Amino acid sequence: MLLEQMDDELDGAREYAQCALHLKDEDRELADVYASLARTELDHYQKLYNQMTRIMTNYRSEHGDMSHELQEFYDWQRTKTMNCMAEVKVLVDSYK
């Protein structure tokens, strides 16, 4: 559930950023709203990511290292979302 919500936040941020960029010359006020929403979605993503990190840290403290499969999945998911977040941040930051 948490991973799906993180993906949803990034997807929303990407969509809002694209709308902002598309509309910035046509309707600046609406574009500004979309840019603000994109930043808010990125903030939501960051809060969820912080919770995922907390959960994983607590798991390691209580149970020791994760299984190899779980660690691989965690690393893959982290890399995927970090790359996606970087892409979305570029979109958001390109809006001026």
Task: Give the ranges of each region predicted by the language model.
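Non-heme di-metal
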Residues: 1-96
